[in-house]
Amino acid sequence: QPFSISGKQGGFEDTRGTLFFDVAKIVKIKKPKIILLENVANFAKHDDGKTLNTVKKVITDLNYNFFYKILNASDFGIPQSRKRTYMIGIKKSYNNSEFIFPRPINKDVKLLDFLENKINSNSPVFKNKKLLKKKEVIRNNCLFNFLPNKPVRIGIINKGGQGDRVYDPIGHAITLSAYGGGTGSKTGLYLINNKIRKLLPRECANISGFPKNFKLSDNPNVSYKQFGNTVVVNVIQHILIELK
């Protein structure tokens, strides 16, 4: 949140933003071969790039080569639009060559395939005939099979705020968030089986790359916050493959 567009963008003036310097202290003492950092996409241009340059200088002064790139989970087999800034520090004495971030795997996936069959949720469910009709128009469109891997917005409910936007699960999910308001807070709203609802905690785990045996908190709000703050497993896996 210190660097997020949806937050106040306090950056290093926010106490959470200064955690990086604690990480730097650990790196200085432990001297790991590789450092992997992740932050919101806006981190790369926060304060006109000064924040990123500060991180780069600190890392390079510790005798590491520094690389960064914005990657989207949607490009790595996960139906969630989640752009994040990934930063890599590689100790020069370990490997002084250029690091190349993984390329998109261009795998067509849909949120629909990551949903749970059994629904046991206290989340409100809505019906909206206009959205049902719009959904059919989209799905019957001759260009439908050529839709890019991204969220497909089909309408709104209530006042139409960010948390009131409704999406079709034939596309990708919007970015899971640890915060936010509105009816679809933290997950967004989706027209599923002709009903409008939020995603379940388990579905949030699914679109974050977590295995089915990953144990969820008994408190749904804890899980929503957890997946709003998490890194997507698939993206990290592809980065680690390139680091081998």
Short names for language-model regions:
Residues Q1-T175, G181:
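Class I S-adenosyl-L-methionine
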Residues K134-K244:
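C-terminal target-recognition/interaction regions appended to catalytic cores
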